[in-house]
Amino acid sequence: MKNVNSLYAILKSKNYWVFLKNFKKSIRMKIIGLASDHAGYDLKIFIKEYLVKLGYTIEDYGCDSSISCDYADYAHILGYKIDRGEIERGMVFCGSGNGINMTVNKHPAVRSALCWNAEIAKLARNHNDANVCSLPARFITELEAKNIVNVFLNENFEGGRHLIRINKIPLFYKQ
């Protein structure tokens, strides 16, 4: 009976539920969603293999080849997954990074940043709490992409004055 009471006390404690919430979040953080069009396909596959080696679980929403296709078809799937809270981070790839970035940013829970170098990725995470990184496949090397991805995944949001600013982003949708 003592063990049952101890277990009950643990389950009732606020600390247990905070731990459980953070544990579930840490598991979701290890899942990275990827999406691309044909121009970003090769870089997406390179980054996908790299992330798997780092221990991440990848959900690849397409495209599946370098045959011409429309980035919106795949960006919306990733955006929808973030909106529903099924994943917390994503990476999108197209030729310039712009089209797929604009599309995924139409989703209310997405804060996607076009990152062409590691410094931009750092600021996007620190100041904007970006949860999607858009990579311009025609303008960066594989090594640059790896550096951007590493920074994007390892930097944290600073909060403070930046939190006030990003909280104003979705106000338009609430009106």
Region spans (language model):
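Extreme N-terminal starter segment of soluble prokaryotic enzymes
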Residues: 29-32
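A short beta-strand-loop structural module common to alpha/beta enzyme folds
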Residues: 57-68
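Helix-adjacent hinge/juxtasegments
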Residues: 74-114
